[in-house]
Amino acid sequence: LPRAAFEAAVAIGPLFGKLTDAVARDTEWLHKTLEAAGQGDEFTERLLEISRTVNKEGLGQQLQLGILRSDYMLHKPTEAEQKLPLFTEQAGADTGPKQFMQVELNCIASSFGCMGHLTSQLHQYLLSRYPAESAALSAALSNGADGVAPNHNLARLPKGIAAAHSAYVQQGGSPDAVVVFVVQDGEANSVDQRLLE
């Protein structure tokens, strides 16, 4: 992934977070928009039922913490797409990847954030341990193993959860309140989630 593309994805992350928060708070629009998806997917329908019930009863807690993972791909336009104004304005002489496309916005994403930390460390290790085997990649990164972006989620996600707990207590919530992790039976990612403990 080119550094400029990675930095663009990092920069846009907070904007996607704000957009997601605004969408989540517009429950009437959200329910209407996802109605057809719920009819075709039992899990989505159950989430919509929970949301409708909570919305009807009224939120008892105004504080919310969203741990989101947004997955992107770089799209290299076809020749036909390159002729469209969107691409010709951006492209110049470069015919490489032109735009990010969001593949998924995962709202149940606490565990994989921590896995990203470990993946970053793995990439740094492999590049430093086997430089000859990864010469092309090291050249693309320009700084070899030092060019791999660090990932601090293993520290940041638990700090975010702790900050949400602290804010809850400061707003009058019970100081004995606990953070509960709900893990479904047979969850394949339970080991990943334990990184947050």
Q: Which residues fall in each region the model found?
A:
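Preference for protein termini
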Residues: 1-197
